[in-house]
Amino acid sequence: MTDTTYDNSTELDPRIAARLKRDAKGLVAAVIQQYDTREVLMVGYMNDEALRRTLTTGRVTFWSRSRQEYWRKGDTSGHVQYVKGVSLDCDGDALLVEVDQVGAACHTGKRSCFLEGGPLPVVEGHRPAEQ
């Protein structure tokens, strides 16, 4: 928790904006996680304005790469994401958005977008025994 006060009232505070490492289209990945269970629900993308709206409205706003417009999860489905916290990773190229998810997070109707795709085959790694 920080005691720094930011002004995101009309645009993303320049001190926050300066910490972001955006892709070529000006976007940062946002990992959406249920705040109390830590379940990973989905990944979306935010530009500066989507992040500003997320930080100031209590609802998650994304930038739709396919529709080229802002969208708030739940405006049409009722499956709202209420913001509980937002963190920036150490490289500045990803956000962790903790939410209280109402209903399904995935457009398929599943709670998590990571249920439909399913697990991929892996060779499981093991930590060496301590000596």
Curated annotation (Swiss-Prot):
Protein's GO biological process: L-histidine biosynthetic process
The protein's Enzyme Commission number:
3.5.4.19
Where is this protein primarily located?
Answer: cytoplasm
The residues that hold Zn(2+) are 90, 106, 113
Catalyses which reaction(s): 1-(5-phospho-beta-D-ribosyl)-5'-AMP + H2O = 1-(5-phospho-beta-D-ribosyl)-5-[(5-phospho-beta-D-ribosylamino)methylideneamino]imidazole-4-carboxamide
Which sites bind Mg(2+)?
Answer: 89, 91, 93
As for subcellular location, the record says: Cytoplasm
Q: Which UniProt keywords apply?
A: Amino-acid biosynthesis, Cytoplasm, Histidine biosynthesis, Hydrolase, Magnesium, Metal-binding, Zinc
Question: A Pfam family name for this chain?
Answer: PRA-CH
The cofactor named in the record is: Mg(2+); Zn(2+)
- Cofactor binding mode and count: Binds 1 Mg(2+) ion per subunit. Binds 1 zinc ion per subunit.
User: A Gene Ontology MF term for this entry?
Assistant: zinc ion binding
GO cellular component terms, alphabetically, are: cytoplasm
Q: In which pathway does it act?
A: Amino-acid biosynthesis; L-histidine biosynthesis; L-histidine from 5-phospho-alpha-D-ribose 1-diphosphate: step 3/9
Q: What EC class does the entry list?
A: hydrolase
- Its job: Catalyzes the hydrolysis of the adenine ring of phosphoribosyl-AMP.
Q: How does it assemble?
A: Homodimer.
Cite the HAMAP family for this sequence. Answer: HisI
Name the protein family: Belongs to the PRA-CH family.
The protein's name is Phosphoribosyl-AMP cyclohydrolase
Q: Which organism is it from?
A: Bifidobacterium longum (strain NCC 2705)
Q: What is the organism lineage in this UniProt record?
A: Bacteria, Bacillati, Actinomycetota, Actinomycetes, Bifidobacteriales
The record's gene field reads hisI
